[in-house]
């Protein structure tokens, strides 16, 4: 339904060949509606297998040439993790400085070669300086869950969290609150390595109503989603969380689960704005009070679930494509 898509991908040599094919087609009269690109998690110049900047201009020059032919160019900029002290953890200082310099080079290049910079949230735009000409547009993640989720009874309160447990994923206050409400239960799904690193901090806070499991991929996660009636993104606030748009938020929505979130985070703002669950302060007392309410009033879980189900289609990947098409059409001056 999106028409014909031409792909420029692969290593530098493969991209060079594909770029030539595209430019020849443009000269022959082919009309391209727009160009959409996505940044790597690495700096663009370091994405070759050897991680050396052997082709520092090629990709940016291609995007600039497309703009000169009047083709709107948009790029999704994935993350600014590199601007935070946490980026340096486990990375040799020299490599860290080189990578950060190359990330800054990317931002300078975007000033010349883009019309639209797509970001997971507009708040992230405060950390990304690409000049005034380039338009910043929010394009959060989506979900690809086509099947209608099976309804889960609202009682007993059964919660599910899937994700990391590192410094950006601090769930300790929430775990302590869950342990104080025996009528509720929480299942944490995380990687074995992350659990081994975190268990000394978490186990003293956990009661018998919290269990840790390890599953990977949609199929393995299905039974845990099916058993839960509420999903959890109740991490302690962090400057990075102010704008971070985790994929898990939209995976939870796709699975039809209302969400417990924390104030002072992007997730909390979305949950509050769209009435997709509950947003509270990140404290043991606040979490415990909410859990007591939900165990005593399961109808509130049912009502929140209905609202999430009503919003599911607004947060699919297909809906995101419609959004980016609209944004790029708006800057087309042909």
Regions found by a protein language model. Give the residues of each.
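N-terminal subdomain of nucleotide-sugar transferases
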Residues: 1-13, 18-20, 24, 30, ...
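Donor nucleotide-sugar binding/catalytic pocket of nucleotide-sugar-dependent glycosyltransferases
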Residues: 99-100, 106-150
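Membrane-proximal helix-turn-helix segments that form the acceptor-binding/catalytic region
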Residues: 57-68, 83, 96-116
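Conserved donor-binding/catalytic core segment of Leloir-type glycosyltransferases
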Residues: 149-169, 175-179, 186-190
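Nucleotide-activated donor-binding/catalytic signature segment of Leloir-type glycosyltransferases, i.e.
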Residues: 190, 197-227
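Nucleotide-sugar-dependent
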Residues: 169, 219-224, 229-251, 261-269
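A charged, aromatic-enriched C-terminal amphipathic alpha-helix characteristic of glycosyltransferases
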Residues: 150, 282-284, 296-329
């Amino acid at each position: 339904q999106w028409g014909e898509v031409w792909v420029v991908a692969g290593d530098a040599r493969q991209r060079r060949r594909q770029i030539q094919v595209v430019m020849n087609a443009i000269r022959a009269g082919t009309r391209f509606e727009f160009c959409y690109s996505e940044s790597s998690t690495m700096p663009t110049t370091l994405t070759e297998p050897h991680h050396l900047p052997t082709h520092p201009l090629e990709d940016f020059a291609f995007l600039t040439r497309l703009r000169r032919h009047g083709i709107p160019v948009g790029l999704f900029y994935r993350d600014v993790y590199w601007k935070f002290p946490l980026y340096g953890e486990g990375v040799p200082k020299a490599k860290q400085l080189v990578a950060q310099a190359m990330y800054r080079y990317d931002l300078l290049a975007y000033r010349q070669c883009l019309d639209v910079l797509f970001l997971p949230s507009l708040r992230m735009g405060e950390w990304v300086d690409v000049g005034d000409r380039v338009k910043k547009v929010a394009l959060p993640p989506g979900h690809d869950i086509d099947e209608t989720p099976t309804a889960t009874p609202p009682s007993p309160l059964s919660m599910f969290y899937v994700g990391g447990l590192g410094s950006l994923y601090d769930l300790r206050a929430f775990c302590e609150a869950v342990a104080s409400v025996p009528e509720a239960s929480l299942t944490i799904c995380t990687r074995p390595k992350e659990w081994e690193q975190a268990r000394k901090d978490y186990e003293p806070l956990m009661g018998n109503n919290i269990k840790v499991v390890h599953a990977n991929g949609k199929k393995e996660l299905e039974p845990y989603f099916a058993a839960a009636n509420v999903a959890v993104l109740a991490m302690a606030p962090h400057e990075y969380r102010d704008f971070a748009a985790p994929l898990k938020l939209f995976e939870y929505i796709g699975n039809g689960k209302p969400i417990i979130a924390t104030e002072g985070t992007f997730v909390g703002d979305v949950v509050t704005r769209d009435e997709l669950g509950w947003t509270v302060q990140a404290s043991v007392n606040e979490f415990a009070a909410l859990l007591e309410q939900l165990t005593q009033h399961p109808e509130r879980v049912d009502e929140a679930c209905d609202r999430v189900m009503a919003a599911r289609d607004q947060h699919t990947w297909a809906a995101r494509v419609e959004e980016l098409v609209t944004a790029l059409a708006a800057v087309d001056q042909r």
